[in-house]
Amino acid sequence: MSSRSSVAVILICGFTSLLLAQAPPAPPKPGPEHKKLEYFVGKWTVEDEIKPNGYVPAGKTVGTETDTLGPGGFYVESRAEGGQLPTRFGFMAYDSHAKVYTSYYASSVGLVGVGTGTVNGNTWTWMVEDKYAGKSVKGRTTITMLSPTQYTSKYEMADGKGGYTTIVEGKAAQSRSAR
């Protein structure tokens, strides 16, 4: 083997060793869109007024919603229970590839749903599709952040004519210590 060939082999082996010895890339960090979800983290007392509808009895109800930040800070897990509404478990995340917020949930009465969300100033708007008993229902949830510890919400169901009918309106509050 010539000295040129020997030098080439040594250089190739050296560069290969360097490439293999490099540390793996650092895991991604949550971006500003993910950080917006942190608003919801904490234990909330939710007071809702259910309007007359064909799904749940009308009336006032009080429940709790506990939201926790998932490992890595990329999503928020949510558990809502108490009152007349079914217990629900779900999560909200920001899909940085599709550039949209997403939500998924399931309830104690077999209702499952998926939605996409946008945030504009202090207002979150979620377009959801609920599935229950073989039917698909489109809806819209609007959340308006009033302060770091208070928000209002409204769930509306598509009426089939291009409009929406309000099903639930409410407000939520949390103590500062719950954050």
PLM features per residue range, with description:
Residues 1-4:
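N-terminal secretory signal peptides that target proteins for export/translocation
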Residues 8-18:
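Bacterial N-terminal signal peptides
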Residues 22-179:
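Hydrophobic small-molecule pocket/channel-lining residues, especially in calycin-type beta-barrels
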